[in-house]
Structure formats: C-alpha cells, structure tokens
Regions:
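Membrane-embedded alpha-helical bundles that constitute the cytochrome b-like, heme-associated redox core
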Residues: 1-187
Length: 187
C-alpha cells in the first residue's frame, strides 16, 4: 500500500504527540497504573479532536460530492492514534484492576472495530447511510463516555471541565454538520 509523504508526516507527528503525552504522564507520577490512566485520558482527548477533524472533512467531502485525500489521511491518523489510545486504556484497566462491565464494553468494542475497518473500506462504501452510521455511532460513543464521566459513573475519572467541553463539541458538531448536510441535500 502506497503511503503519501503527507500521511507519513501526519502519522509521525501523531505518534510523537502520543509519545509526548506518555512522557509527560511518566514525569507526573511513578505509579505505572496512574501513568497509563493519565496517558489514556489525554490520548482520548487527542482522539476526540482528530475525530472532529475527520467529521469536518467528511461533511465537506459529502457537500462537494467528491472524495477527499484530507479525509482519508485524517481517518488513517485517527485509526492509528485511537489504537495507541486503546493500548493506554487497556493497560490502565489491567494495572488498576478496574472492573470490566460487558454491556458498557460492547458499544466501545463495536466502535473500535468500526474505526479499524472504516479507513480500509471507505472507497468501497457506495451507500451514504453507512458513512453516516460510522460518524454518528463513533460520535455517540464518545458522547456517552463523556456523559458517563460528567455523571460520575466512570471509575477513576472525576468530572472535569473538559468533559463538558468534549460533550458540547460533539453535540455542536452533530447539529452543525447535520444542518449543512441536510441543506445540501435539499438543493
């Protein structure tokens, strides 16, 4: 598979940012469980930002009715970085002996599968509804995660200002991008 120079640069920058997150968290504490918990927290925030960039690129690719290399690149970067986040998260759960609740895990598991598969299949998907399902489902999983933290239902993560910002940015992007897509379809 041919990887463009721009994509390589984005992947390297993304990896370096994830490494910087880990190093900063390593400097904050000497407890490995806490290091990976903090790394997962900040890596997840980075993933949210990249997801919103992907959703932005998708919306404008849809409006222009043409495939965008920026969209494909941002999706590959999102997939790559979100799997680094998954490693941090899995190690945090393991090292901190956090309980695994299968019902809550199912939604996230499906989202991770979609994040892995979608960048590989984006060019093969002809029905627009499947693209919408990807963006809205992954966004809903992000939103549910932040809402759970805000409500205090997430062990090891007290409510923070960023949780409100994260949830608000997801809701705002859903509203804005849905309006843009619907207006375009009316024309």
């Amino acid at each position: 598979m041919f990887i463009s120079t721009n994509l390589k640069k984005l992947l390297i920058i993304g990896f370096l940012v994830e490494a910087l997150i880990f190093v900063c968290c390593y400097q904050m504490t000497d407890n490995w469980g806490e290091i990976f918990r903090l790394s997962a927290r900040y890596s997840g925030r980075l993933s949210l930002i990249i997801y919103l960039i992907c959703f932005f690129h998708f919306t404008f690719s849809f409006i222009k009715k043409k495939s965008s290399q920026k969209l494909k690149n941002s999706l590959i970067v999102f997939c790559f970085l979100h799997y680094i986040h998954f490693i941090f998260l899995a190690l945090s759960v393991y090292l901190n002996d956090l309980p695994i609740i299968p019902l809550k895990l199912t939604g996230g598991f499906i989202a991770y599968l979609m994040i892995l598969i979608y960048p590989l299949m984006i060019n093969m998907i002809k029905k627009m509804i499947y693209h919408f399902i990807f963006y809205y489902y992954v966004g809903i999983v992000f939103a549910a995660t932040y809402l759970s933290r805000i409500q205090g239902n997430f062990e090891g993560a007290n409510p923070e200002t960023f949780h409100f910002i994260g949830l608000g940015s997801i809701v705002a992007s859903f509203i804005l991008f849905t309006i843009l897509i619907m207006r375009f379809q009316e024309k």
